[in-house]
From Swiss-Prot:
It comes from Escherichia coli (strain 55989 / EAEC). Its main location: membrane. One of its GO terms (biological process) is glucan biosynthetic process. It comes from the Bacteria. It is a multi-pass membrane protein. Belongs to the acyltransferase 3 family. OpgC subfamily. Pathway: Glycan metabolism; osmoregulated periplasmic glucan (OPG) biosynthesis. This is Glucans biosynthesis protein C.
Amino acid sequence: MNPVPAQREYFLDSIRAWLMLLGIPFHISLIYSSHTWHVNSAEPSLWLTLFNDFIHSFRMQVFFVISGYFSYMLFLRYPLKKWWKVRVERVGIPMLTAIPLLTLPQFIMLQYVKGKAESWPGLSLYDKYNTLAWELISHLWFLLVLVVMTTLCVWIFKRIRNNLENSDKTNKKFSMVKLSVIFLCLGIGYAVIRRTIFIVYPPILSNGMFNFIVMQTLFYLPFFILGALAFIFPHLKALFTTPSRGCTLAAALAFVAYLLNQRYGSGDAWMYETESVITMVLGLWMVNVVFSFGHRLLNFQSARVTYFVNASLFIYLVHHPLTLFFGAYITPHITSNWLGFLCGLIFVVGIAIILYEIHLRIPLLKFLFSGKPVVKRENDKAPAR
C-alpha cells in the first residue's frame, strides 16, 4: 500500500480552486458569446466568445485529473466502505442541498424570464421529467458524475491496488507520446460510441440523466483514473509538473482545431464526435500546461489562498443563479459587452463571498454545502476553570 504523503499538495489545491472559480467568468462570458444560452446579450462579443471557448475546452478535464489524484489518496487512507461514504457525502450532500435551494428557484425564474411558464402544463410527463433533469442538475452535473465515478472506482481502485501489489511500480515508465496515443484512441472510442447511439436511438442523447450519468462519466473517467495513476507513480506526476514546449504547442494547435470545429462543424454531421476526439487529447496536454504552471507559481501556503480553496465549491454553487439573474435583469441595461462582463464579475463574486461568509456562521448550512460534519474542538467541550 502506498504511503500518503505528509505534505499537502498546495499547487493542486490551488489549481482545483481556480478551475472551480473559472466557472464564474466562463458563465458570465457565455452571456456575451455567440453561443445560445438561457440569457444572451443583444450583440455577441468575438473576444468573449473566444475566451469562453478557451475555458470550456480544457477546464473540466484538468479538474477531474486532480479529483482522481486526491480521491486515490483518500482511498489509501480509509477502509473501502468509509472511503466511499466520505467521498459520496462530500459531493452528494452539497448537490442535494443545492437543488432545492439554488437550481429549483433558478428554474422557476427562467420559466418566467423565457416566457415558458404558461406552456409548462401542456408538456408531456416525460418532457417535464427531462426538463427538470436538465434544469435541476444544471451546473451541479460534475458532482453527480463524481458520485458515479466514486462508485465505479470502488472496483477500479481495488484492481489497481491489487495489480500494484503483484508488480514493481518503479519499472513503470510513461511518456507523453504514449499517453497521447492512448487518449487519442479513447477519444475515437468515445466518438464511435456516441455515433452508434446517434444512429440506433438518437432521442436518448437528449435525455438529461443519460447525458450526465453515462456520457459525461464515460468521457471524463479516463482523466479521473489518470489522476489516480499520477498519485501512484511519481514519474507520471513529474511528467505533468515539468514544463513541455511540445505539450504547449500541441495544446495550442488542438485549440485552433477546436475553434474550427465550432465554427464550421454541424451538429447533424460529425461536430460532436470530432469535438470529443479533440478535447480528449487537448485535455491531456493541458494537464501538463496547467500543472507545470501551477507547480511553479502556486506551490505555497497562504491564508488568502486557503480561504478561496475552502470557499471555491460554495462560490461555484451559488454563482450560477446569480449569473442568470444578472443576465436576465441587468445585462439588458448595459450596452457595452466588456463593461457588462466586468460588472457581472463584481456582482456575482461580491454577492457569492457575502453569502459564503453568512453560511459559515450557520452550522447547518456549513454542513449542507460542504458535506463535512462540524467538528467541535475539545477546548469547547472543556468546563471553564
